[in-house]
Amino acid sequence: VQSENGANLPTADQLASQLLQVATTLAKQAGDMALAGRKAGLHNVQTKSTATDMVTEFDRASEVLIVEGIRAARPEDAIVGEEGASVSGTSGITWYIDPIDGTTNFLYDLPAWAVSIGAEDSSGPLAGVVYIPALGEMFTATRGGGAFLNGAPIQSNNIADVSQALVCTGFSYSADQRTIQAQRVSRFIHQIRDIRRAGAAAIDLCFVACGRIDAYFEENLHQWDISAGILIAHEAGCRSGDFSGHTPRPAEILTTAPAIFDQLSQLIMAASASDR
């Protein structure tokens, strides 16, 4: 393939590999910086949308490191970051960055926080990395290339009965919304194995991908929360959609081991009917 000026362009697979290499390098650098900083102590913690929606100096420093790294490696790409990064581009590639997904866990020194970097083209996620520094775990995927944990292939669980499913979810920063969501879960918790709440969407998606949980659902997220994780889950054989089974979107996402998607979708939809 050649560009208009005659230069050879990378194939889709080559491009995905290049994007993955950039993302992996930057996720490791940013995550290790944040981990070292957390061990040294936090000095600048502020609130965002609510009194419980936090941002630390390391959220911002991580995003700056990643944005500068992407701009140096791929200056024509667009970038969108949780902490305000917004760079327009001309290449057709857009990066979605969550510099620390699970900031509350980071604040409390719980290990379930991650750096999430996804690169998308017009067809959706093309390459994704979720790095969990406190666990030393790097989840990676490229479109059509499979999903990996520290270089080893991963796949979702082979579970067929939703009553045996360990299900993860997340709750809103809004107290009113949290109450509605908790009531919803209470309506079907007796019909599944149990509920877990990790506190980081990117990690939840990766844990479905590698079989540590069987399903994950949440609402009112952003593209930077799910861009990398949903690709990793897809490449690991998971099924994703909104709660009713249509195209997954940040406003509403359900990702499961493939055989239980419809069963869990029905439980969530039935439980949600009572709060509308």
Residue ranges and their predicted role:
Residues 1-100, 266, 273-276:
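N-terminal subdomain of lithium-sensitive/metallo-dependent phosphomonoesterases centered on the IMPase/IPPase/PAP
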